[in-house]
Amino acid sequence: MIFFKNLLFFILVSTFTIIFFLFFGIILIFIRVFSSKTIAQKTLRFLIVCYGRIIIFGFARILVKVKFIDSSEGKQALDPCVYVANHSSASDAFLMGVLPGEFVQIVNLWPFKIPILGLCARLAGYLSIRSMSFVDFSKECKLLFSNNISIIGFPEGTRSVSSQMGKFHSTLFRIAKENNLKIVPLCILGNKDKPLRGSLKINPGNIEIHKLPAIDYNEYEHFSSFELKNYTRAKMQIFIDQHKEVI
């Protein structure tokens, strides 16, 4: 039964992806011709979020129930901010569609190699942290922040294989410090086998995305980037350890 549910899911998603981006691709070309690159990018980012939400809350319900939970305890962050999430599955990037506001995802090189979606990510201005120097990356981020656009990244860099997160890289935290921005930790629970690393099989179950209390600049201004990444990681790991029943 799980096999046939997976088969149905991939058939529906593949068909929907082709139709969705062909149809809206024509609209985007029209927008790009008669308006600015900025408007075209904003439109594409909005469409990518819509696409992700349809996948998450529509087709994925064949196998998985996804829930977004605000665990911020009133400590919210307005755009722009820096979202950081734990990373345990190839589905993590799609799950970011639950977030409000306009944002750009910070990714490794491999997502850009995915047919159709990779091209859309490039056109939407998503950034590959591996393909540019920190100086260039910082300039791109400052431009996004000036337009009230947040960034989202996975500071582990690679997927963890257990509930214990890997070491964090410092880049996103350097960016937050340079721009005096709030950091919003996101804890994704229940997705490590949706799918497992090296597999396309999605196992049935529940996924929760928790938005933790925002870390204000005043809270970390005296930290180095190294201290800040470890401070943030510790907060996230404590939360994950407290919710192991979901994992």
Give each language-model segment a name.
Residues 1, 5, 69, 228-234, ...:
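Soluble, non-transmembrane catalytic domains of enzymes that act on hydrophobic metabolites at membranes
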Residues 1-81:
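Membrane-anchoring hydrophobic helices of lipid-metabolizing enzymes
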Residues 29-49, 77-133:
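Catalytic core of membrane glycerolipid acyltransferases/transacylases, capturing the structured
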Residues 72-76, 142-147:
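Short amphipathic alpha-helix with an adjacent loop that forms part of the alpha/beta core around
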Residues 91-92, 137, 193-198:
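A short, acidic/glycine-rich surface segment
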Residues 116-118, 161-227:
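A cross-family acyltransferase "interaction/gating" segment
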Residues 144-172:
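Catalytic-site beta-strand/loop segments enriched in glycine and acidic/polar residues
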